[in-house]
Amino acid sequence: MTELEKDCLFCKIIRGEIPSYTVFENDDVKAFLDISQVTKGHTLIIPKKHLVNFFDYSQEDAARFLQYIPVIAQAIKKSDPTIKGLNVEVNNGEIAGQVVMHSHIHLIPRRSENDPVSTPHVNNADEYS
């Protein structure tokens, strides 16, 4: 185990050193409720292999990990009929808002237009076109 893995918050959750509310788990991934819920049911999916972010992924890592997004999203939707939509968010690197340096995907259920938004939606079409 590397020093990075030893001190990694999500690696500690995978090893059971830190408790979590697990939604889904198998040999490849663990999904659990985010401690800082943007909305009720906000879930994180993490690979059990320590990868900092998508820049570290091989094609095999991506295939192994990303296939579970729809499985977990469908389970979240099935668990709560009030869910009308779902944001799937990934922050790669500190500059992009990544806080825990272990790759993870946010699944944020949406029930109404009044739900808090974690990513600001700004129209920059004039600036970037």
Residue ranges and their predicted role:
Residues M1-S129:
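HIT superfamily nucleotide-processing domains
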